[in-house]
């Protein structure tokens, strides 16, 4: 029997199933992912990051950010290794993509961009665009488009972290 190399699709499926199983443990009261990063709507940048579950509230938002990056990097690096790709190049590129993406996602979650009219008073603001925190995806997407078009050499160096799966 020939040694069959794993495809990106199969590795993506395995990683997705692994994360799903970890999340599904919550059904039995075992929360192993409550420390994962949550990007909040904010007016004070110090409130932008938190953990997803208040049971982990002793962990700062920045610690959650770093732990989320480390866990994602480790899991995805295993997948990259299974594909026979260069893990070092992937880790470097993924680190840059992760932090750039999270920075711009956080900017999109600013209350002046994200707060709906009924949330303005909660944040002490008198106006907002009202796009909800999903606006962070739009801001991060725009940043990616700008980087790929204005800095093609940088975009090429980050290609190892931008697999479609």
PLM regions: where:
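Structural signature of multi-pass alpha-helical membrane transport proteins
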Residues: 10-54, 72-84, 91, 95-164
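N-terminal membrane topogenic signal
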Residues: 1-14, 61-62, 89-90
């Amino acid at each position: 029997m020939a040694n069959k190399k794993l495809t990106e699709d199969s590795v993506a499926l395995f990683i997705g199933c692994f994360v799903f199983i970890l999340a599904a443990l919550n059904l039995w009261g075992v929360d192993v992912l409550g420390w994962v990063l949550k990007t909040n709507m904010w007016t004070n940048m110090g409130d932008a990051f938190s953990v997803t579950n208040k049971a982990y509230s002793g962990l700062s938002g920045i610690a959650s950010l770093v732990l989320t990056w480390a866990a994602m990097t480790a899991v995805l690096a295993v997948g990259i290794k299974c594909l026979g790709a260069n893990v070092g190049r992937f880790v470097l590129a993924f680190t840059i993509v992760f932090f750039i993406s999270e920075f711009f996602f956080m900017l999109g979650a600013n209350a002046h961009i994200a707060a709906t009219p009924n949330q303005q008073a909660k944040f002490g603001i008198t106006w907002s665009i009202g796009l909800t925190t999903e606006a962070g995806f739009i801001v991060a997407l725009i940043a990616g488009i700008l980087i790929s078009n204005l800095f093609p050499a940088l975009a090429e160096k980050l290609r190892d972290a931008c697999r479609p799966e």
